[in-house]
Amino acid sequence: MGLSIAWRLAQCGCPVTVYDRGEAGRGASWAAAGMLAAAVETEPGEEKLLTLALESQRLWPDFARELEAASGISIDYRDEGTMVVALTRDDAEQLRFTYEFQKSLGLELDWLSGAEARRREPHLRPGIPGAVLSLRDHQVENRLLGSALAEAVRRAGVMLYEHCPVHEVDIASARACGVVTDRGYDRADVVVLAAGAWSREIGGIPRSHLPPVRPIKGQMLALRMDLEMPLLRHVMWLPRGGYLVPRRDGRLVVGGTVEERGFDDSMTAGGLLTLIEGAWRAVPTIEELPVVETWVGFRPGSRDDAPMLGSSGIDRLIMATGHHRNGILLTPVTAGSISAYVLTGRLPECAEPFTPERFLNARVGAAVRSGLVTAPEAR
C-alpha cells in the first residue's frame, strides 16, 4: 500500500521516501490472490465498505493502464469476472440469501443454474445446484502489481530503501517529526504509516494511538494447469470461503485459510488439506495437477475488518493500514485518498467513515492531558 501512496504523492511533486522492511512489493500484496471482488464479497453490515470498494473498483482499469505506462510492466488486469458456486442444496440456499442481499444493494449479479454454470466452466463438478456470476469483479496479477509499483516509484524519483524497517516514529511537541531506521534518523514533514500487519510493531507511537491491527494468517498454494487447456476462466469462489484464481502463466492459485495465529509462517498439513479438499470438491480434475508453490501471508486485520485511512490523532502521522482481505482491491482508492489527505487535510467522502479515530478510546484523554499528543485535527 505504501508504494501506491508514494507514487501518487511523487506525481504531485512531493519528495517521498519509502522504507520497506523487506523487498519492495513482496509483503501482503505479494502473498495475495489479486481479486477485485467488491460485489461477491459484500456481507451484511459492510454497506459503507462497499461504497469505498465500488469506488476503488471503478478506478482500477485506468489505474492499471496508468501504472503499466509508468512502469513498463504489465500487471495482467483481467475482466472475465467472478463466479460463486454452490455444491449442495444447503450451499444453494445460503448463496441465494446472499445473492438477494447483494442485489438489494444494487449490485449487478446473475443467478445461474447448475447447467448454465457448467456451460461457462465445464470442469465444475457435475450436479452442482447453482452459482452466482459477477462480471464486474475482476482480477489482477498481484505479484506483477508489486513489481510495477516498485518500478514506478523509482522512475518517479522516490527514495526507496529496502530491507530497512522503521523502528520508531519520532514524536515531539505532539507531532510526528521523523523516523528512526537502521540508517539512522530521517526528518519528515509527514509520516504515513502503511506497515500492514506490522503496524503495531513500530515504536515511538503512544499506545493509545497504535492502530488496532493484527496479523491474520493465510496459507495458499498454486497448481500448474496446461496452458493449452486451462481448467478455469473465471475467478471461482467456493462455499466455505476458499477460491481458485486462474493465471495466464498457467498457475491456478488456491486460497486461502483464515487463521488467528500471529506471525506463525509455517505451512501445515491441515491447511493444505483444507485448500486442496475445498478446491477438489468444486473442480475434481485438479487432482491431476502438480503443486508448484506453497506460501503464507499475513493480512492486516483491524478490529472491525475495515481499513484505517487518515488522521492517527497525532499531528502529521497518517494511517493507511488494516485493509484485511481487500488490500489489492482498495489500492487505487487508498492511494488517492491518502495523497489527497497529505496535500489538503481532507479525505474523499467515500473514505471518511474509515478514519482511525473511530477506534480512539478513553486512553486518548490521558495522553492529551500528558502532552504526548494533541486532540485529532486535520492538517
Predicted regions, residues:
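Hydrophobic/small residue at the entry helix of a nucleotide-binding pocket
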Residues: 1
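Short beta-strand to alpha-helix junction loop
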Residues: 51-54, 85-94, 132-151, 266-271
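Dinucleotide-binding Rossmann-like beta1-alpha1 core, especially the glycine-rich loop
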Residues: 35-120, 278-280
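Active-site substrate-recognition segment that forms the wall
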Residues: 4-12, 18-21, 34-36, 40, ...
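Short loop/edge segments at beta-strand edges and connector loops
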Residues: 113-114, 162-164, 293-295
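C-terminal catalytic lobe of FAD-dependent flavoproteins
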Residues: 283-379
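Helical element adjacent to the flavin cofactor pocket in flavoenzyme catalytic cores
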Residues: 131-190, 194
